[in-house]
């Protein structure tokens, strides 16, 4: 959980007191639980529990696949603040199909002490599918953000998991002024560990615009297409062909242990990276579910 012992890179921050509202105070520990099950009418949200800052307004008939269900996570707050600890748990039952996103970008606010953390756990039952495609994360100046996500796939399960990072309020000329960002993704399947991926950026210590990191680009995004029972080499080649036609600098590669494919994209605007990753998502969904991806519009 996000409130547990932090990653070693964040241990020093964890000892810093938060003056306005301590870690663990009401409104600081956000919890969201969603459970989807397959029913006679398709997929149904059978359990939901949310505490501030999370809120959902039911499900939406939004997906091109009739038997799928959609939830957009809402937040009444201005963003993620220092000392916030958020835990999200999404469970998709056997043969169920769910799409979960956020209604708007996650804004990680400027911090003077401590840090913010989010722990997301995704579980997909046998033959089920989950699309977890939130809006971008925007890292304001001096922010410190730890993001951990784990995915567990049952036999025959598939998932698409996406993440886009914007390193500041670009319209203001704010770029790479955050203090630390660490994102870790882990995936397991019926036979155990599939892969682990990490992004750790500390602009004050190492230049993220250096060659081999982000170079001349600003926005960074990744989409993981997790499909252990599919031919990852064939899927990787197909997705690579799709994303290299976009405006972003992008490519696709097969993940270890037959887990699926990772698609990465770099660009100067969030919209450019999102469009490229959406093209990959759309192609993957047609391959996995014989249905296109939903539109990225939320209004």
Curated annotation (Swiss-Prot):
Domain of life: Archaea
A GO term from the CC aspect: cytoplasm
InterPro entries: UreD (IPR002669)
Major subcellular location class: cytoplasm
GO molecular function: nickel cation binding
Alphabetical UniProt keywords: Chaperone, Cytoplasm, Nickel insertion, Plasmid
Subcellular location, record wording: Cytoplasm
Pfam families, sorted: UreD
HAMAP family (alphabetical): UreD (MF_01384)
Family recorded in the similarity comment: Belongs to the UreD family.
Assembly: UreD, UreF and UreG form a complex that acts as a GTP-hydrolysis-dependent molecular chaperone, activating the urease apoprotein by helping to assemble the nickel containing metallocenter of UreC. The UreE protein probably delivers the nickel.
Function noted in UniProt: Required for maturation of urease via the functional incorporation of the urease nickel metallocenter.
Protein name per Swiss-Prot or TrEMBL: Urease accessory protein UreD
Upper taxonomic lineage: Archaea, Methanobacteriati, Methanobacteriota, Stenosarchaea group, Halobacteria
């Amino acid at each position: 959980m996000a409130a547990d012992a932090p990653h070693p890179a964040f241990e020093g921050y964890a000892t810093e007191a938060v003056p306005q509202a301590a870690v663990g105070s009401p409104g600081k520990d956000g919890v969201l639980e969603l459970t989807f099950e397959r029913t006679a009418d398709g997929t149904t949200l059978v359990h939901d529990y949310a505490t501030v800052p999370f809120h959902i307004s039911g499900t939406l008939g939004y997906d091109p696949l009739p038997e799928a269900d959609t939830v957009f996570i809402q937040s009444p707050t201005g963003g993620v603040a220092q000392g916030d600890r958020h835990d999200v748990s999404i469970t998709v039952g056997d043969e169920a199909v769910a799409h979960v996103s956020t209604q708007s970008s996650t804004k990680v606010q400027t911090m003077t002490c401590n840090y913010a953390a989010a722990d997301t756990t995704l579980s997909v039952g046998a033959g089920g599918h989950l699309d977890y495609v939130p809006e971008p994360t925007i890292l304001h100046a001096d922010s410190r953000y730890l993001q951990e996500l784990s995915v567990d796939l049952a036999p025959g399960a598939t998932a698409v998991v996406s993440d886009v990072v914007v390193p500041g309020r670009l319209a203001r000329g704010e770029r790479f002024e955050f203090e630390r960002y660490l994102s870790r993704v882990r995936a397991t399947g019926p036979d155990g560990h599939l892969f682990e991926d990490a992004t750790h950026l500390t602009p004050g210590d190492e230049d993220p615009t250096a060659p081999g990191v982000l170079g001349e680009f600003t926005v960074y995004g990744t989409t993981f297409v997790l499909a252990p029972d599919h031919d990852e080499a064939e899927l990787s080649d197909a997705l690579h062909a799709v994303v290299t036609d976009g405006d972003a600098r992008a490519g696709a590669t097969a993940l270890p242990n037959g887990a699926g494919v990772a698609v990465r994209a770099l660009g100067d605007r969030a919209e450019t990276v999102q469009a490229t990753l959406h093209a990959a998502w759309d192609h993957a969904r047609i391959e996995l579910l014989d249905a296109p991806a939903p539109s990225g519009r939320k209004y």
